[in-house]
Amino acid sequence: MDPECSQLLPALCAVLADPRQPMADDTCLEKLLDWFKTITEAGSSLLLLQENPCLVELLCHMLKPQDLSSRVLSFSLRLTGVFAAQEDCFQYLQQGELLPRLFGEAGPLGGAAWTAPTVRSGWIQGLRSLARHPSALHFLADCGAVDTIFSLQGDSSLFVASAAGQLLVHILGLSMQGPADGPPSLQAGDWPACAQKIVDHIEESLRSAATPQITQALNVLTTTFGHCHDPWTRVLWVRLSPLVAGLLEKDPVPAAHSLVDLLLSVARSPGLSSSSCGLWETLAQTLSRLSPTQAGPLALGILKLQDCPQALRAQAFAVLLQPLACVLKATTQAPGASGMVDGTAGDSVTVDTLLPSKAACVGLLCRTLAHLELLLPLPQRPCPWPQASLLGAAVTLLQLCQGSASPTSDAGRHLCALLLGCVRVQRAALDFLGTLSQGTGPPELVTEVFAVLLEYLRSPDSSPTVLKKAFQATFRWLLSSPKTPGCWDLDPQALLFLRELLPVLQKRLCSPCWEVRDSGLEFLTQMTGRWGGQASFRHALLASEVPKLTEQLLRDPESYVRASAVAATGQLSSQGLCVSPASPEHLGGQQKSPLSELLHILSTDSEGFPRRAAMHVFTQWLRDSHADVVGDTEEFVAGVLQVASQDLDWEVRAQGLELALVFLEQTLGQPGSPCPYAVTPPVVAPARPLAQALQPLCRVRLFEFAFRALFDCDRPVAQKSCDLLLFLRAKTASSSSPQEARISPDVASVEAALQRWQAGDQAQPLGDLEPEVVLAVLRSMDLEGLRGALAESSDHVEKSPQSLLQDMLATVGILGENEADCY
């Protein structure tokens, strides 16, 4: 510990021990505890206490009957655990009876402070810290702490209850590390005392008729098998598995969700051989005993396992598919035909679960669709995969929700009434349908997919979120449409669908709901980016009003829509698909180009989102050599940087630096790698003098923009500028000739201006800079040091331990105002 901190520590301990003093907030106490943890991890806790006796006095003061702050008491309990984690310091604290009086029945356990959850939490965390050596185990057994931990598992505070369960797992693991001659015996008498007590309590809880106690026991076991993988865990499972299996004989099965978590934790544990401990049989029995809602997560977990018997995988997949099989069975006209894999025809239990209420029906279907969506991309997904049946089920669900299905059975009509207009199922089914686009399907089913998507996009009843997901699913299915080898154009079926879709998109772009307009523009941007160069798509799009509407939406009252319109316009313009109508200001026929429109938005829009979108478009245009840019690249870059430098949004300024970097790379050129198989080496163009190469950068005032950004008040902008200038300096250093390196122009005026900028006075511009001056300034600047300073947190000075102690003392007036840092 620093001498300065040692001098401040006695005063701070006196403040903490005095209940009359105003107490520092929890953040200060947490930082103080972290500091002590750092000290004890690096050195001796015993030496720390001996050199700073005020710490022991503080802990002893907690034992006096007084009106202590619960926060300070909790802090002291945790601090004691930090010190006692080292065995020699533990023995030192034991000699003074400090540990039994703090953590035993004579301590906070019997006082009024125990009613505060923060004290109970501090007690648990203190024990968690000190339980690291054999002496701690004997202490826990002797002071009765384990029994208290058992009771805290049912604490009213969820944080305390969870911490108690985790502490039991930690103590159990520490106890079982004792035997060095192999795993412990199955005989109860051979288990260490603490471990035996915990396992006995778990056994008693599993035999209990009270569901909360069963849940607590299952949660402890789940954490144990999830974190402990030593051989003794197999012994533990063999001992307790009959009691776990016995839970399946109860009706209903208690704590089903916790039981599922435990079984999956055991199945994933590398310390267990599932085939030799009866786990597969227990999993199969559990699948058959749980309700469909409870069994879904278990079935998904089983199917995610790498090594699992095929029969169990088939059973789990059948359980997962049952709700969708019921949907198909209830709506199909062919009796008994669900189309799913064997064993999923839709048993009576699942039908009863689906139909009683809308909440049960919707919840089960949404969970089933989510589970299948997670399973689809996995390499261990079941094979064969019933792609056609799942497509049919997803389409049927969407039709039921839309009211376009015509079920003939009573169950089907009931299901239709439950799902009609259900947005939750619509969203889940559209997500699942989009994921299914990764596979193939019969042509007639694909036609149904496009039909139901078009139905949703057309329907006035579709909510904005449903429409967004319908657009997303539509794009994914268009991407997956069959293609002719060597041709990326849309196939005839997709093209026919597109011609029906564009009028719908036109209508959605005119929607009074801004979320719908925004989703339509995002969809248009995706479509144009993918098929903008294809003749069939171009012809269909230009024959519609979509480009004109997109241009009009650049002036939408909602900023999110304007931003999406900017992105769509950028994509349309890149593909030559923009239609520029006469502007309202020039009715005689003068037209505005997309570049002029977006520059106007960058200069005048009152919201940040459209301006950011414009900067992204400009950067992409420069990178792709857009037609409007290559005509006069320097004028384009200079104009954009001039506007961006004055923008109040730091993201716009940062994107301006990205554009500057692209221009810099294009101007100086990136060294390319010659083809190793070329017959003759490529002809290298003679390199231009460095000063000549930098002239375009000077003409667009790129350096003034970068230097100004270097002292930006927003750190991300300054960091990006620093990286750009470091890149430029490295680039020029490798390209400059010895003669250029020896040139030493007068840079005093530029450096003086930069110093004023750094001080906050950026009113005076740098003016025209010559390349030689720029190179000299770059060589003289400590950019590496600046980058290091920018990488530090804004409060790195005030985060020191000395500053923390001063601030805590200043809150009670012990230090003068000028002696404390503010952070």
From Swiss-Prot:
Family per similarity comment: Belongs to the BRAT1 family.
Q: Which residues carry this modification: Phosphoserine?
A: 744
Recorded GO cellular component terms are: cytoplasm; nucleus
Name of the protein in question: Integrator complex assembly factor BRAT1
The HEAT repeats extend over: 495-531, 544-576
Provide the protein's localization: Nucleus; Cytoplasm
Q: What is known of its domains?
A: The BRAT1-like motif mediates inhibition of the endonuclease activity of INTS11 by forming hyrogen bond and hydrophobic interactions with the active site of INTS11: Cys-822 coordinates one of the two active site zinc ions of INTS11.
Q: What is the lineage of its organism?
A: Eukaryota, Metazoa, Chordata, Craniata, Vertebrata
Supply the source organism for this entry: Ailuropoda melanoleuca (Giant panda)
Where are the annotated coiled coils located? none
